[in-house]
Amino acid sequence: MAGLGVTELLIILAIVIVLFGASRIGDLGGAMGRGIREFRRGVRDEDATAPTDASKNESK
């Protein structure tokens, strides 16, 4: 993982907690999770509504 060990990751995590605070990190994580969920839902809906190549050829 790009040469990062456990110690380096813990140091980075500690710096992030100091900069943003624990509650802010939870809010950011929740917002990121909601964004990813909405993106996946949008991709899935787009795939369901998009006609396939086979159905395009049958209608011609």
Curated annotation (Swiss-Prot):
Gene3D superfamilies linked to this entry: 1.20.5.3310
Molecular function (Gene Ontology), one example: protein transmembrane transporter activity
Record key words, sorted: Cell membrane, Membrane, Protein transport, Translocation, Transmembrane, Transmembrane helix, Transport
Transmembrane domains' residue ranges: 1-21
Annotated Gene Ontology cellular component terms: TAT protein transport complex
Entry keyword annotation includes Protein biosynthesis: no
GO BP: any one term: protein transport by the Tat complex
Topology with respect to the bilayer: Single-pass membrane protein
InterPro entries: TatA/B/E, TatA/E
Intracellular or extracellular location(s): Cell membrane
Function: Part of the twin-arginine translocation (Tat) system that transports large folded proteins containing a characteristic twin-arginine motif in their signal peptide across membranes. TatA could form the protein-conducting channel of the Tat system.
Quaternary structure note: Forms a complex with TatC.
Similarity section: Belongs to the TatA/E family.
Official protein name in the record: Sec-independent protein translocase protein TatA
